[in-house]
Amino acid sequence: MKIRNTILSLTALAGFTASGQMLDPAKLLQKPIDTWPTYNGDYSGQRFSQLKQINSGNVHGLSLAWVTRFGSGPGVTIKSTPLLVNGVLYFTAPNNVWAADAHNGRELWHYQYPPNTGSTIGNRGVGMYGNWLFFESPDSNLVSLDAKTGKERWKVQMTDPKLDYTSTVAPIVVGNHVILGIGGDHMDNPGFIESRDPETGNLQWKAYTTPRKGEPGLDTWPDEYASAHGTGQTWMPGTYDPQLNLYYVGTGNPNPVLAEQSRKGDNLYTCTILALDVNTGKKVWYYQVSPHEVHDWDASETPVLIDGVIDGKPRKLLAQASRNGYYFLLDRTNGEHLVTTPFIDTLNWAKGLNAKGQPIGDPAKFPRPDGVLVSPASNGATNWPAPSFDPETGLLYVGASKSYSMFYVTDTDDHPEGWAGLDASAGTQGAALEAIDYKTGKIVWQHEWPSGGGPSHMLSTAGKLLFTGNANNFIAFDPANGKILWHAGLTGPVTAGPITYELEGKQYLVLASADSLFAFTINQPVK
């Protein structure tokens, strides 16, 4: 296999020069057109493209351009948003990185990470700096590859292997910083965000997501031991404001996950949106969306950056539809709370909001030995699948789930560990694609999925189109009113965020489903 891949790489890449593979850093600061250079297309997290060659007037002519299967073993699922740089797609599955020709889907090279004991739940993709790619392995190594050949440049261990951390994050490259996150809350390990040098992999800074001794926030835990084992993992990439030089990232749930008796208090900085100085990792502000969270919901969903208008004044905003079922709108310069409102009507775990707009958890809905019925379910009202914001409609598009779980505590010890409980699905009132007014949190329209299902991935464009998927279709909606304009059948669900790009004058849409990439375009001449 290695010999075959090497020959394939050399043959397929003969027409590519090293300079041709280099990512122009300026592309990261622009709305994507002929590139998709970072996880969300640009730093804002909006997943909005200025392209409009494919538009509401001609989307009915969209057809399959190519499909390629990239299998590397049973059960492989591509959960990574592909990057597109200079005509090459880069994408991942756990332990695997591929490069493919964006014209036709032909594999250019395939890097396979050695067998390891890390979790293979998923991998969100690569980051890129110049000619180099970066991805996190399941056993928490940062690996750097040559983008032209797929050859490994170096790898560095991010954590002590004995601690059994896991890694799923797509690195985000900001200047000369490769910003990383971590997973593994089941092992009681402290969460962190860190930055490494793209040249060497050396650590530049590390910001823990639970407070150390002498740090602010420790008083929200019973003691230093509880905080040190409180996790707050950072398993999704964040967003970035280049004017403020702030990186925004959501943190995971506290630990023990379902048993709260050993961690009384708000448990900072779990289930929190953090704003970090990119140069130092210093916490500039924070907002906790779920104080003292007890249902395995996190705040890891994309913090979407919006330059909007509130009460007639321009504001730099941050919007998040969070896993706990609430929509939050903040001032991203200082964390000031502006809006909190539920985006599912089955939500039953909170008694109301406090003065800061934070939900007040109802102790009657905490997990207990005989179980308690709660909505949203353990997977949340939404989850990691990417939302999208269309600045032309002013709507945030989110996949929403109106489901229930029974939550149980199974470890009533004074100091439980790990999950310390279990949850079981307890039915659903359906799932929907929701269009949320960013200013108010009001649901402007929604499309109920007839077969139920859960949140899917979003992409909006200046062509007055919104793309997403359900259990086995790729679908285009009118973003203003939710009318279905086009759809194509797939062999399964959309498993990663769709992207769009222009290549040699033609616009393409690319999406992942299971172990394959599908590309769509309009093959007849575009008027």
Region annotations inferred by a language model:
Residues 21-73, 106-115, 151-160, 202-210, ...:
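Aromatic (tryptophan-biased) beta-strands that constitute blades/sheets of beta-rich domains
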Residues 36-40, 75-95, 118-142, 166-190, ...:
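Repeat-blade elements of multi-bladed beta-propeller folds
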Residues 45-159, 461:
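N-terminal cofactor/phosphate-binding cores enriched in small/glycine residues
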Residues 101, 146, 197, 277, ...:
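Structural recognition of the beta-propeller blade-terminating site
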Residues 191-202, 266-281, 334-335, 431-438:
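Beta-propeller blade signature
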Residues 292-294, 299-302, 342-348, 377, ...:
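Conserved blade-ending motifs and adjacent loop-strand segments that build the rim/top face
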Residues 401-402, 425-483:
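Loop/turn-rich, solvent-exposed surfaces of beta-rich toroidal or solenoidal domains
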